[in-house]
Design a protein with these regions (language model features):
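Glycine-/small-residue-enriched transmembrane alpha-helix faces in small-molecule transporters
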Residues: 1-39, 147-176, 184, 197-198, ...
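Hydrophobic/aromatic residues within transmembrane alpha-helices
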Residues: 29, 37, 41, 89, ...
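Cytoplasmic-side transmembrane-helix entry/capping segments in multi-pass membrane proteins
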Residues: 12, 66-74, 121-133, 181-190, ...
Length: 301
């Protein structure tokens, strides 16, 4: 492993672990109105991130108009879209099933890097993608379906899969940015743009509901979501992914379903079987192979 990439790899691994914990937090927040839950999350995160920018005296980023539009698109698709679809899906399916479904993210991320960004994957890179996908298949086989094949359960799984597709786009859109942006500024912009996008819908939901009405555990889950995955996770991911190829970054998303499943099992007292541990081993092997890949130049044309 290249020593100069040690920090980017560690940052992306930690970021994906925090993203995996959103499965637990989102399941706890599922009782809240969707946009109200997101409003609480992004409001807390935005205040913390803006305070950090002020304390650290980070200069305002100078970006082209096209880059500002791209950032808004990232916030809409990968932040608001992912959160809304995940919260809706977790209201219909189990946390363990949702964790397993996120196993589609490594393959989607790497393939988008190939077909959208024009990057090339070596045979080792394709092998890493295959291992990551196989790990998630094993996790799904080991877990089985906890909700049967009814329409509600399948609908929840479909919503979670749609959220995963949003996340895959989100993780790669920043590769389209022409100017370098400080990771802390990137996290702050994503959070504040997301807050602005979901605020009108949250106000409508609060008005229709006659004011806030949810448990303290759901509110604390929203605060955790804001401080750890949204604030710390955004910063870690942008710190790491800005220094490696999109395909390499995509491999690290194999940690999302692994951490999601293990944290769901720990929090909700769900059993973890030997097949799950085997799946974890394959996911880790995929990361080892992925980090050994040398970045390839974009395809000509």
């Amino acid at each position: 492993m290249n020593r100069k990439h040690l920090w980017p790899y560690a940052a992306m691994a930690l970021a994906m672990t925090t993203v995996g914990s959103t499965i637990v937090a989102s399941k706890m927040m599922a009782q809240m109105p969707i946009f109200v839950a997101m409003l609480a999350r992004f409001a807390v995160a935005s205040m913390v991130l803006i305070a950090l920018l002020w304390v650290l005296r980070k200069p305002w980023p100078r970006l082209l108009p096209a880059s500002w539009r791209l950032l808004v698109a990232q916030a809409f698709v990968g932040s608001v879209g992912y959160s809304a679809l995940l919260l809706l899906g977790l209201g219909l399916t189990s946390a363990a099933d949702a964790s397993v479904i996120t196993g589609a993210l490594p393959a989607l991320g790497a393939l988008l890097a190939v077909f959208v960004l024009g990057e090339r994957l070596s045979p080792a890179g394709w092998g890493a993608v295959a291992l990551a996908v196989l790990a998630m298949v094993l996790l799904q086989t080991g877990r089985g379906s906890s909700g049967g094949g009814d329409a509600t359960h399948l609908g929840g799984n479909a919503l979670v899969l749609a959220a995963v597709a949003c996340e895959a786009v989100f993780l790669l859109l920043n590769k389209r940015l022409r100017e370098p942006i400080d990771p802390l500024w990137m996290a702050a912009l994503m959070s504040t743009f997301s807050l602005a996008l979901c605020a009108p819908f949250a106000l409508v939901q609060l008005t229709l509901a006659g004011g806030p009405s949810f448990s303290s555990s759901a509110l604390w889950a929203a605060v955790y979501y804001a401080l750890v995955p949204t604030t710390l996770g955004f910063w870690l991911w942008y710190s790491g992914s800005s220094q490696v190829s999109g395909a390499q970054a995509g491999i690290f998303t194999a940690l999302l379903p692994v951490s999601g499943l293990l944290l769901s099992a720990a929090w909700f007292a769900e059993p973890v079987e030997p097949r799950h541990w085997f799946g974890v081993g394959l996911a880790v092997l995929a990361i080892v192979i992925g980090t050994a890949m040398k970045p390839s130049p974009p395809a000509a044309g």
